[in-house]
C-alpha cells in the first residue's frame, strides 16, 4: 500500500523545526507544533499507523481516551490500524514521566484490543529500551 499522508505532531517546536528543515525537508509531511491530546485528536480517525518513540514522555496509551469530548477511546476510532511504540527504563531523566521496568509493564499500558506482533528489548548504558509493534 502507498502512504497517503504523514503527520508529525510534537509539543517541542525545536523538534518540529529540525524534522521539517533538516531531517525530512524533501518529504511531503504535515508538521504540527502542539499537544496531540488537545487539538489534534481528530487526526486519529484517518490514521492507520501510529508511531511514538517517546512513550516515556506521555501517559500510557490506554489512557489516551476516552475524554469527555469523545464517547469512544482513540483505539476504537481507528481500527484497523498498526502501531510502533517505544519506551525505556531511563528513570533518571527528569522529563521521563512514564518509564517502565519491563517489556510486560510496557505491554500492560496498551489498549485491551492491541495485538503485539513484535517485541524487543535493547540494553543501553542508561537503561533498557523497549519496542512494541502490533495492530489494533
Q: Model regions: which residues?
A:
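General small-molecule cofactor/ligand-binding pocket signal
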Residues: 7, 30-32, 117
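Short, well-ordered alpha-helix to beta-strand connector turns
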Residues: 3, 47, 78-81
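Generic beta-sheet signal
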Residues: 9, 53, 84-86
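C-terminal substrate-binding/active-site "lid" region of AdoMet-derived donor-dependent transferases
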Residues: 60-135
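A short SAM/SAH-binding and catalytic strip from SAM-dependent methyltransferases
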Residues: 37, 45-63, 89
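S-adenosyl-L-methionine
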Residues: 11-49
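Conserved SAM-binding motif I beta-strand of class I
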Residues: 4-10
Amino acid at each position: 500500500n502507498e502512504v497517503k499522508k504523514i503527520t508529525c505532531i510534537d509539543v517541542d517546536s525545536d523538534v518540529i523545526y529540525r524534522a521539517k528543515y533538516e531531517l525530512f525537508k524533501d518529504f511531503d509531511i504535515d508538521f504540527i507544533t502542539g499537544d496531540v491530546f488537545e487539538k489534534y485528536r481528530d487526526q486519529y480517525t484517518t490514521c492507520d499507523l501510529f508511531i511514538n518513540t517517546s512513550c516515556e514522555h506521555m501517559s500510557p496509551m490506554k489512557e489516551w481516551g476516552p475524554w469527555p469530548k469523545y464517547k469512544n477511546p482513540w483505539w476504537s476510532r481507528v481500527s484497523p490500524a498498526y502501531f510502533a511504540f517505544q519506551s525505556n527504563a531511563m528513570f533518571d531523566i527528569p522529563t521521563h514521566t512514564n518509564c517502565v521496568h519491563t517489556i510486560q509493564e510496557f505491554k500492560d499500558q496498551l489498549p485491551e484490543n492491541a495485538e503485539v506482533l513484535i517485541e524487543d528489548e535493547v540494553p543501553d548504558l542508561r537503561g533498557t529500551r523497549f519496542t512494541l509493534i502490533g495492530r489494533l
